[in-house]
UniProtKB/Swiss-Prot annotation:
Name this protein carries in UniProt: Myb-related protein Pp1
Subcellular location field: Nucleus
Described purpose of this protein according to its UniProt entry: Possible transcription activator.
The UniProt record lists the keyword DNA repair: no
Encoding gene (name): PP1
Molecular function per GO: DNA binding
This protein's GO CC annotations: nucleus
Length: 449
């Protein structure tokens, strides 16, 4: 036993110093915490009296002991509750095992309680004062009190089932047959009825009915005509018209497409300024002046109408199909747009002067400007003047041939000779390009003289 201190000795600490530190510091600290320094268990009151702990430290020791006893009792109660619950669902073999564990836990709990009773008696008055000051009085909570009016679950379920089986008020609406057979064409009404569908609420039945007769949809013939007019293509054939009078889909009482109330003046031949204006797609109400009309067309209906398709695209009929195509072709041959005019003006501003082609005897800059896009591009390509540099190019070829012949004959192997050779070539080309740059103003002065 004497060598146990040397087993934990540090290089600069002897076993005697470690033993003294244990006896003077660590042992007293464990005793103040209520732990036996030998067995590392909670100490009893007799041991505390035997070790004569300071009276000022006794409240700390007692609180530690009471907390430990509370945790032990709570643990024992939890184990007992778990064993009781498991005994209801486990087989007989598990019952025997849990009963043994329960007995062992009860014995250990009784031993702990007996050991801690003596240590907690001398501080009972102090503990009572602490509990009264720190723990508020919440009153008595009655958790096991039965409710005053118990709920009859069976009666509640029966009432719920009967409410589900009761007939529900049906929501009346348009049927499939009505949606197919009672759809009138666009010629029988105006577009305002299509935009603002009327609803008639029935207060007695608490349901809303939407009359299908108020829904206005365009006829197939008008849809095909509008698609044909919107494509602006001569290669497309006109779509076949559908005779609504002989069709089985629409009823006999629905008006045909020939009774259209829309009349378009001049097949919607509008100018570019008013084609997309707000007034081109809106009709004035009936209360306005009768002289007001849309630039694109008018309606003879008594209701207000907003027909975007009819005002944006013209209706192309079979009898005047050729006339409408001629009208569309005439619309394309208009004045050039703003950007085309700007491009022509830019090309005219960038035209070369007469001295570029003075040797050829042609003065392209005096050509009248073209106002078409294709002609402006062609004129821009044709007006590119090429300076007459044939003598200078021949001079460059001759000088380069002389340089190459001199380089091969002299066999310039030294760095100095190569340096002088390239420096001479650099200054020669610098002089050539500077002369080529300044020769244009010189030729301009000669032409002015």
């Amino acid at each position: 036993l004497g060598n146990r201190w040397s087993a934990i000795a540090i290089p600069r600490r002897t076993d005697n110093e470690i033993k003294n530190y244990w006896n003077t510091h660590l042992k007293k600290r464990l005793m103040q915490m209520g732990i036996d320094p030998v067995t590392h268990k909670s100490t009893a009151a007799e041991e505390l009296v035997h070790y004569s702990i300071i009276p000022g430290l006794r409240p700390v020791v007692s609180t530690n002991l009471t907390h430990m006893s509370q945790w032990d009792s709570a643990r024992a109660e939890a184990e007992a509750r778990l064993s009781r619950q498991s005994s209801l669902t486990s087989p007989a073999s598990d019952l025997a095992q849990t009963s043994l564990e329960h007995q062992k836990s009860n014995l250990s709990t009784k031993n702990d309680v007996n050991n801690q009773v003596a240590s907690s008696n001398f501080m009972s008055s102090w503990k009572a004062q602490v509990t009264e000051t720190l723990r508020p009085n919440f009153g008595v909570v009655e958790l096991d009190k039965p409710p005053a009016s118990p709920v009859n679950l069976q009666k509640f379920l029966q009432e719920w089932e009967s409410s589900l089986k009761a007939p529900q008020p049906e929501m009346e609406g348009p049927s499939i047959h009505d949606s197919i057979t009672n759809i009138p064409s666009l010629s029988s009404g105006t577009a305002s009825e299509l935009v603002s569908t009327q609803y008639s609420p029935d207060v007695s039945s608490a349901s809303y009915r939407m009359p299908v007769s108020s829904m206005i949809l365009p006829s197939p013939a008008q849809i095909s005509e509008r698609l044909m007019a919107s494509r602006h293509c001569d290669s497309l054939l006109p779509l076949p018209r559908i005779d609504l009078a002989g069709s089985n889909i629409f009823p006999a009482q629905s008006p045909s497409a020939t009774e259209s109330s829309f009349s378009f003046s001049g097949l919607c031949k509008v100018d570019n300024e008013h084609q997309y204006s707000p007034t081109s797609i809106l009709h004035g109400p009936s209360g306005h002046d009768s002289s007001y009309s849309s630039p694109c067309g008018s309606s003879s209906s008594a209701y207000d109408s907003v027909d975007i398709l009819a005002q944006t695209f013209s209706l192309v009929h079979n009898d005047n199909h050729q006339h409408s195509r001629a009208t569309l072709a005439m619309n394309f041959s208009q004045e050039p747009s703003f950007w085309t005019q700007q491009q022509v003006a830019l090309v005219d501003a960038l035209q070369p002067e007469s001295y570029f082609t003075h040797e050829l005897g042609v003065n392209i800059a005096q050509k009248p400007p073209s106002h078409s896009f294709n002609l402006s591009v062609n004129s821009m390509v044709n007006q590119v003047g090429v300076p007459n540099n044939i003598p200078f190019h021949s001079l460059i070829i001759c000088v380069e041939s002389i340089f190459v012949a001199y380089f091969r004959r002299s066999r310039c192997t030294s760095i100095a000779n190569l340096h002088m050779f390239f420096v001479f070539r650099f200054y020669f080309y610098l002089f050539y390009f500077s002369f080529d740059f300044y020769r244009v103003p010189l030729r301009r002065r000669k032409s002015q003289w």
